[in-house]
Structures are given as C-alpha cells and as structure tokens.
Amino acid sequence: YHYLAESEKAAEHRASVAAYANLDGQEKNPGVPTLAVWAGRCGDATCSKPERNMPGAENVTIPNATHVQTSTSLETFQRMFKFFTGKRAKRDIRRVSKKSTIQLAGKALEFPQNTGLIGDKVEIWPLSSGGVRTTLKPIASISITDGSEGGGAWGPVTAKPYQRYEFALVEPEGKTIHVYMEPFVRSDYDIRLLGSAAISNDTGKFPKSSGAVTIRYKELWGNEPGQNDELLINGLEICTASLCPWSKEVNAYFAINWEGKEETTLKEEPALSSLPFIQAAQVFIRASEPPSEIVSYQLKSRTGGALRTLNIPNWEGTKNQTEIFWNDFDTPNS
C-alpha cells in the first residue's frame, strides 16, 4: 500500500501497475485495480474484525483459512490467476518422469533480515529414504558471495525428481544447518535456505541432544477436532491443543531441549513462543557426533493427503541445527 499510495513516487508507481492483489492485509484501496483476499478465520493477531472489506476492490474470502494459508492456498492462486489474466487456471497434474532431471536454485538468507549468508557454503547431498547421505561428496558445493539484502543466490543445480536431498548450510566457523525438504516433483528456482540466530542459539544449547524447527507455510492446528494437523516426532504428537491453537497461527514449531533435561515435557519455551507464527516446546532427542540414530518426523495434514515421513540423523545440536520444511500443499493418498 505504501509503495502505491504513500511513497514519494506513488503516482508514478500506480501508473506502472495494472493490477494488485492484497493478501489478508490492510483495508485501504491503493488506487489501482485490486483483488483483496481475506482469511475466512479471524480473531487472531493478524485481523481485528471478520467483516473486512476494501472499498472499490474485488473482495474474496477464503473459507476456513487462516492468515498464511490464505496466501499460499490453491483457492487464492485460482482467484489471483483469474483476476490478473481474465481466464480460469487449469490444473496441471502432470509430473516429470523419474528418469528425467530437474533444476534446483534459490537463495541462502539470514532470517528475518533477508540478507545473503555471505561466507557460508551450500552443500547438496542425496539421501536414502532413511535420511542417510548416499554419496561421499555432495553433488554441489556453492560458496555464497553476495551478502546484500535479497542476495545469497545459489544454483541452478541439476538434480533428480522424487529424490530426497539435504541442503547443508556450512558456516565459516564450522557450524552447520541441515535443511530437509520433501522430494521435488519438478524444477524449483525459489528455494529459500534460512539461517537465523534464533535457530543457531536455541536449537542447540545443550550437548548430546538434538532439536529441530519444523516449518509449513500453512498454519498448524491442534485444537479443532476433526480438522487438526498431526505433527509427530518418533511417534509423539507435539501439535497439541494448548500448543497449536488455530489462533496462534503456528508456522514454525521449535522442538528443542531448552530446559537442558533428558526428558520430553512439551513445556512451552517462553521467549520464542511469544513471537507471532512461532511455537517452541521442550523435546529431548538423544544425539551424538557423528549421528548414531535416525529420528522420524511426520506430518498428517488437516486438509487431507497421506501421512508424510522425513527420517533424519540425530545431529548433535551444539554444532548442528536442523530445519524441516513441509509442503503447504497436500500429497494424494494414491
């Protein structure tokens, strides 16, 4: 809104914009043709009243959706595509052959500053279904040389579809953030690998224990019977009603040994949990260097699809941190 209506060159900016989509944000019309998309669920930190409306815009509400889900959902994409092109989006369910290759690329960024992780190295390792590296060397090792805002570019790297990969962010001082994602089914040029002081400082405070932050850009719900997400670590449900109420809008869940105890209590960590979109709880995962066990992370989405599993080594947390990214879209059961 500021860019189109309040900035020094607002009139010039409006003249260059044919149409604009406002995703569950403020309610003032920016002065260009606008699609205003609203979350159907309101009453949380991101919206003050459910009857939101932007005068003069095409207003659309996504039923039973929360804030971030509204930005990433299929329903929102369909409405945006129609608004921008005048045509209905056709769903392409074709998948690339397992024998073909895909391209992977993106940025390595410090969160939330969005600056490139200059000096870090991105290593890409193929994994077995059990989460173990299958090669002696990474298929790619790329130094990050651009530390500017929006920098940190890496790739493209030739890879295989349906193959699991680990993206290792190796810091100059020797610490590593191990990033795990679900297998890619097509080329992706917008993979964000995130470094963060919170991740480095809070997931590895105590030796001989491991921790992880699990991220999905669709809120995790735990207090809505019949439409809850299941988020499991070694079979333990961590997305409980008290830790994942829908109004908390949990996108990032820190399962960490913040108390320094060899037990899992799911006690809420106060500092991280006070932040929007974040939850953190006491979870003890035994760890060693080198890893000696496999940890099972699983997700069953509230909106359908099969139970998903990512098996990951029990990296020792003082020098290794783990990030797990779940797709915001659902995988069919068949």
Spans of model-derived segments:
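Beta-strand-rich domain onsets/edges
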Residues: 81-102
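Serine-dependent carboxylesterase/thioesterase catalytic core
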Residues: 1-45
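Post-His helix in hydrolase/transferase enzymes
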Residues: 70-81
